[in-house]
Amino acid sequence: MALDLRTIFQCEPSENNLGSENSAFQQSQGPAVQREEGISEFSRMVLNSFQDSNNSYARQELQRLYRIFHSWLQPEKHSKDEIISLLVLEQFMIGGHCNDKASVKEKWKSSGKNLERFIEDLTDDSINPPALVHVHMQGQEALFSEDMPLRDVIVHLTKQVNAQTTREANMGTPSQTSQDTSLETGQGYEDEQDGWNSSSKTTRVNENITNQGNQIVSLIIIQEENGPRPEEGGVSSDNPYNSKRAELVTARSQEGSINGITFQGVPMVMGAGCISQPEQSSPESALTHQSNEGNSTCEVHQKGSHGVQKSYKCEECPKVFKYLCHLLAHQRRHRNERPFVCPECQKGFFQISDLRVHQIIHTGKKPFTCSMCKKSFSHKTNLRSHERIHTGEKPYTCPFCKTSYRQSSTYHRHMRTHEKITLPSVPSTPEAS
């Protein structure tokens, strides 16, 4: 990460960074920290100096910065390693992830200002780790740190795309085109559930990102929500296809070109996206396996040239999906791929949403309490499922044998027993409320 010297050294330095070195640093600020009434006079002096001489202000600025660095780093007293340590610590303090500068300062002093000893004693309690960002590009997806440069993300995913294309070519399977994985502009949706409202739009992301074949590269960057979500196979929600969503926020990426991929001013769509939603079938179509999620976070209709709704069929089972992202998440189950790993217990998950739900277990937080028996739960959906024990409600009814169930997970396990003996056509039942 490049240092912005103007930001670091013209402004007041970090409060708790380097102890006594800051005194010399603050004293060298010069007239730039005068009282408010003296600012205009100083500005005129600087302007006149800049206009009347040949780049004298530029030379003065460089000399001022040299004095600041010299008085701060004191090369006559410190070795090269000590100077590097000072710069590293300063960058760590202003990097945005340090949440307890006072504690870091104390550890720096207690280590004798030795960087190696300081690193050994430093724990994650004093920093905010960078958030994880879920990136989806041309059918490939991965989890990256928010600090990772966009060019590295694109290079990594491009290698995955090329590897998959090579495998498909060897198998004689036509590869997916970029049109199949492009996300077109979807209509905004409003969702109100569990007291949570959201309104968002999914935007097609293809501006100025091209590869050597002049094909559009669609890049979706999804900021995963940390809120609780029902974990598949556990105590599930009262509606098997409801989920929380985050607003989509657009941001501008870096500019650059690498390995034939050009990306300039790439709009990045950030929000809770389709990949993070658990893949489940609705009760009405449990055996036809066609997704009917009208308010899904994949509210992106991919249509052909004649406006016909596309569908995506799994090659290993009869399931058909309306959205490509659901198919990709489903196929990971056939391959038993669990790319999302808990850093605490190393347990793998098929979907990022499952990982988020699992991580709440490690926190030990159970903020939702039953009003009848005072039992606590980590998720509101789990609480609602538990409350049905008291009310006797069983909203999930099998369309074949009319057996009712309190939890959707139990309902889906029961429906799989019918899949082995029933034709694909399934009578529909009213949606459980």
UniProtKB/Swiss-Prot annotation:
Zn finger intervals (C2H2-type): 312-334, 340-362, 368-390, 396-418
Keyword annotations from UniProtKB, A to Z: Chromosome, DNA-binding, Metal-binding, Nucleus, Repeat, Telomere, Transcription, Transcription regulation, Zinc, Zinc-finger
Listed transmembrane segments: none
Single biological process term from Gene Ontology: negative regulation of mitotic recombination
Localization: Nucleus; Chromosome, Telomere
InterPro entries registered for this protein in UniProt: SCAN_dom, SCAN_sf, Znf_C2H2_sf, Znf_C2H2_type
Record's keyword annotation contains DNA-binding: yes
Cellular component terms per the entry's GO annotation: chromosome, telomeric region; nucleus
Top-level division of the source organism's lineage: Eukaryota
Stated name of the protein: Zinc finger and SCAN domain-containing protein 4
Organism of provenance: Homo sapiens
